[in-house]
């Protein structure tokens, strides 16, 4: 049937998003200028923030870059903020953009090594409880130094690969479409496949939570960590040590949850790898090992050496994080023989959409600063006692981060805390403690939903999720024990351990206060 030009434009607008979603975004774009000019810029600013959080929460309906970007462009156009203020925010956070562009791309060229490691873990550890713990620990360690998205991408690659191998064997190679189970006519084979799906689901969730447990600990673990570290004037070691009073107890209890849910088969965990599947995968791995050439073996060794360089460069703060990532790209591609421009370009595909979205975040942050939107909330929190301030910052961050994106939330709150310090409302010592509360608040409770953790959202929207029947609801349910324990232990750490442990670390000479002058933090 022929459609009118108007219908064609509406169909093209935001692509395959639901009609109600398209109407909501159009409604926002119509209402915002009216409220800004005829009601109140402050109210319009808050409407923009809520609308932007809505686009983040609806990320499965439409990637937030397009609707959020339209709202941000309009905000600049009508005068909610200026292009100069947006450019200033981007300049202040250039390190974060470099982290996303170069570090994620750099790790892309180390995927062979990471795939090798996770494959060996899966096939060589027979105890499901120990295997789950190993996946959680490996993801945590890698996420402390690499980007969580990349770590999850690698685990997804391993899982999809294994699923494909077994699915093709069990369906007698009759159909290469791994989404189609019609070739599996044996009831026993169906049950084995369902058990394998449950096994992969639990492993993916353990790995996903592992990225959060490790990612909160270091300044490169999550993008917002780098923003917080820069604002507070911390280097890699400072950040790690300052977070320990909260992150270490959370890490220990997170691993305990991993063991308990597997041992007692709670919340959908506990499924074993079927023996039939193990045999198929082991045979395949043996064939792959036999075919591996000397060239490929040397690539793995080179990538391992580059991995050591990456850890040392970050730990010793030898260069800015993005530049370390760039060095990884150059070293890995040079010594692994990747010199084709097209092959290089693939490495940047994963990170650039999120980098563009983060730039839109900064435009919304510019509106928040220009319109002083969070000033009343911050004033309310800062009226409380210093210890209560820490808990309130942690809880406010946690609540918002579980429904919105934690990079956005962390950026907004650290800017407000920094502003309070610069205006003499809080001391330097209190600002440093608030920075810890903000970082842990944005990272820990955000495992509650896929909206909060970019790695979880990446998993949910991946090709693997439908194969292993991992839906939004199931992901929230399986994350629940982790959410409750990590949030509560984190809060107790902020409330009871953070202040005394920080004082002890300062007296012991492990940490010292940075010099902050002219809005710039200079670490010792």
Swiss-Prot record:
Taxonomic source organism: Yersinia pestis
Keyword Transmembrane helix carried by entry: yes
Gene Ontology molecular function: any one: sodium:proton antiporter activity
GO cellular component: plasma membrane
Similarity section: Belongs to the NhaB Na(+)/H(+) (TC 2.A.34) antiporter family.
Topology versus the membrane: Multi-pass membrane protein
Encoding gene, per UniProt annotation: nhaB
Membrane spanning residue stretches: 13-33, 98-118, 140-160, 239-259, 304-324, 325-345, 358-378, 448-468, 479-499
HAMAP family associated with the record: NhaB
Name of the protein: Na(+)/H(+) antiporter NhaB
Keyword field: Antiport, Cell inner membrane, Cell membrane, Ion transport, Membrane, Sodium, Sodium transport, Transmembrane, Transmembrane helix, Transport
Function: Na(+)/H(+) antiporter that extrudes sodium in exchange for external protons.
């Amino acid at each position: 049937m022929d459609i009118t030009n108007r219908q064609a434009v509406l169909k093209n607008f935001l692509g395959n998003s639901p009609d109600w979603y398209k109407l909501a975004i159009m409604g926002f774009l119509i209402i915002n200028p009216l409220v800004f000019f005829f009601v109140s810029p402050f109210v319009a600013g808050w409407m923009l923030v809520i609308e932007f959080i809505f686009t983040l929460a609806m990320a499965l309906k439409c990637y937030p870059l397009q609707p959020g970007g339209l709202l941000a462009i309009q905000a600049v156009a009508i005068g909610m903020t200026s292009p100069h203020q947006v450019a200033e925010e981007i300049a202040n956070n250039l390190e974060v953009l470099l982290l996303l562009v170069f570090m994620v791309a750099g790790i892309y060229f180390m995927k062979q090594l990471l795939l090798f490691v996770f494959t060996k873990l899966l096939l060589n550890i027979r105890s499901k409880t120990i295997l789950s713990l190993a996946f959680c620990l490996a993801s945590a360690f890698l996420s402390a130094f690499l980007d969580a998205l990349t770590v999850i991408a690698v685990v997804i690659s391993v899982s999809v690969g294994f699923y494909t191998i077994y699915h093709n064997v069990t369906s007698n190679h009759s159909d290469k479409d791994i989404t189609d189970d019609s070739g599996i006519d044996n009831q026993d084979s169906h049950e084995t496949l369902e058990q394998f799906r449950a096994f992969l689901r639990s492993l993916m969730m353990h790995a996903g939570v592992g990225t959060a447990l490790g990612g909160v600990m270091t300044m490169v673990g999550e993008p917002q960590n780098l923003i917080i570290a820069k604002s507070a004037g911390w280097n890699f070691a400072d950040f790690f040590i300052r977070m320990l009073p909260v992150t270490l107890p959370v890490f220990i209890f997170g691993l305990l949850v991993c063991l308990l849910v597997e041992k007692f088969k709670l919340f959908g965990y506990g499924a074993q790898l079927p023996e039939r599947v193990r045999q198929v995968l082991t045979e395949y791995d043996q064939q792959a090992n036999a075919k591996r050439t000397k060239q490929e073996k040397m690539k793995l060794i080179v990538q391992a050496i580059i991995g050591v360089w990456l850890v040392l460069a970050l730990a010793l703060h030898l260069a800015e994080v993005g530049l370390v990532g760039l060095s990884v790209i150059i070293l890995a591609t040079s010594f692994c023989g990747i010199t084709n421009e097209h092959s290089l370009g693939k490495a940047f595909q994963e990170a650039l959409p999120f980098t563009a979205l983060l730039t839109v975040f900064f435009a919304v942050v510019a509106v928040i600063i220009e319109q002083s939107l969070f000033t009343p909330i911050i004033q309310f929190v800062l009226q409380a006692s210093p210890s209560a301030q820490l808990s309130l910052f942690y809880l406010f961050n946690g609540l918002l981060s579980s429904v919105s994106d934690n990079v956005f939330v962390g950026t907004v709150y650290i800017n407000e805390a920094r502003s309070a310090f610069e205006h003499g409302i809080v001391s330097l010592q209190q600002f440093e403690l608030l920075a810890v509360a903000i970082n842990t608040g944005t990272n820990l409770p955000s495992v509650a939903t896929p909206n909060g953790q970019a790695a979880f959202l990446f998993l949910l929207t991946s090709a693997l999720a439908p194969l292993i029947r991992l839906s939004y609801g199931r992901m929230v349910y399986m994350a629940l024990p982790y959410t409750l324990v990590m949030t509560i232990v984190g809060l107790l750490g902020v409330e009871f351990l953070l202040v005394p442990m920080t004082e002890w670390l300062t007296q012991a000479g492990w940490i010292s206060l940075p010099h902050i002058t002219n809005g710039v933090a200079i670490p010792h």
